[in-house]
Amino acid sequence: MPVPALPRLGLGCAPLANLYRAITEEEAEATVAAAFDAGRPVTYLDTAPHYGLGRSEERLGRALAGRDRASYVLSTKVGRRLRDLEPGETPDGQGFTDVPDRARVWDFTADGIRATLEGSLTRLGVDAVDIVYLHDVEDHLPEVYATGFPALAELRDQGMVKAIGFGMNHSDVLARLVADLDVDVVLCAGRWTLLERTAYDDLLPVCERRGTKVVVGGVYNSGLLADPRPGAHYDYAAAPQELLDRALDMAAVCGEFGVPLRAAALRYPFAHPSVVSALVGAASAAEVRDNTAMFDHDIPDAMWHALVERGLLDPDVPLPLAASLAAGE
């Protein structure tokens, strides 16, 4: 089946599961409502069992209750199956706070893939999802090739999901999987950004050749491109001074054209024609509105050329110029 039409901006729903800080049920529901009510409706929503040990899916399901299922695109992930804790066990939040009494189990068997998806459907309160990604499989490739992907492909063939693929931040592994398998779409985090071109060199060429769609995440590289300052994070760790300086220089150039660095970071991945959507997380309605405002911010072509001229973008990479973006809408 073809990949469902995706809006350019999607909502990453990990923050709904108390990622790094707790939010209330009301805040989670308001976040999702704001996505639908935005001037540019954010109607692609991505979640996973991993996010808060099922809490993201549960909260998203409650927030979507009563909405027309045809009005949004929904993706989740498989590879980590959830189970109830045994007596004496404690949950491992892995960055999520106030999590349910569950544990994650890597499971790429056919039965495990199906059970994981069925659990997600129950938590989400829906009969089907549109896209299913195999999640963070870089250390499990033999199992993926032997059973995980074939099981997911069977679900696609049976019409239980519309599109299948992989989601991770290792673009080289994604490139190999796209080359080897019948992959509809990939979710690549943090590897095609203002600061990181790895995916441009390894993943995007094979996706363009194979007709595989690309959803990008991590456009701010863990925060450095959202707020470049001492102590900012890059790929989940403190940003090296060299990258901090480069981000600050980029922010200065963008500022000369009246453009926030966040707006440039969110727009940039669409320079490549294989990129169809960008997922950005939000933990409040205000953050959703800010994301949409950043995405719709006017960016003159001259700003992109200035970044190249000052050595802040490589001269061989494509630029998200207005004419090319308009053609892709």
Annotated model-derived regions:
Residues M1-Y72, R80-D84:
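N-terminal binding-site loop/beta-alpha segment at the start of enzyme catalytic domains
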Residues L6-G10, V42-Y44, S71-S75, A128-Y133, ...:
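Structural preference for beta-strand elements that scaffold enzyme active sites
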Residues L11, A28, L45, L60, ...:
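Conserved, mostly hydrophobic/aromatic
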Residues A22-D37, T109-R123, N169-R176:
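Short, acidic/polar
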Residues A63-R69, T122-G125, L177-L181:
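Acidic (Asp/Glu)-rich catalytic clusters
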Residues L85-F96, R229-A232:
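Short, flexible, mixed-charge acidic loops at enzyme active sites
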Residues L121-H140:
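Active-site groove signature of glycoside hydrolases
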Residues V137-E329:
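Beta/alpha (TIM)-barrel catalytic core signal, keyed to glycine-rich beta->alpha loops juxtaposed to Asp/Glu
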